């Protein structure tokens, strides 16, 4: 890996420290309940952080209909059809992602129903290398997570409620997008599948 390439993970870490951590651990009441952000998207500011959900919940964001809504909102918040994600973490009750939006990084905390719970803009502008390695939203399959979970249930007895979260990422070797699935019971073991959810296999 060349020196410039090393900048990308460092940038991701810096952005996560700036906005991602705060969004993932947001607590406490909000003053207003509903407002609109600069992209015209409704921001849900209820009395506290949304409840965590299990994978089998009807509103689980692992479901294609929920993930499709979230991806559409991310496109509106970002740079339209060409929006890329520097990070993308999908849990049954939330999505935490950092996307590019017309020359800036935007940290999003999305909840079921295609709603934004929190949004912040990073002062760090996207570098060319960061954008090259980021994952285009159009490559994320809304049916991938559910397909992956169904396959793991059949092969390994893993149920939707066993799922802690998934990460959409670009494989550093093949340069192809993939899903990494982590379980609640074992943080050291994860499963990898193609971005469409096909061919899941255990890693570590």
Per-segment meaning from a language model:
Residues 35-77:
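N-terminal low-complexity, Pro/Thr/Ser-rich intrinsically disordered segments
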Residues 1-5:
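Positively charged n-region of N-terminal signal peptides that target proteins for export
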Residues 6-22:
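Hydrophobic membrane-insertion alpha-helices, especially the h-region
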Residues 51, 55-58, 62, 70, ...:
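Predominantly extracellular/lumenal beta-strand repeat domains
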Residues 73-108, 167-193:
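Exposed beta-strand-loop-beta-strand "reactive/processing" segments of non-cytosolic proteins
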Residues 114-162:
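Long, charged/polar, surface-exposed segments that mediate recognition or autoinhibition
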Residues 107-125, 188-204:
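A short, surface-exposed beta-strand/turn
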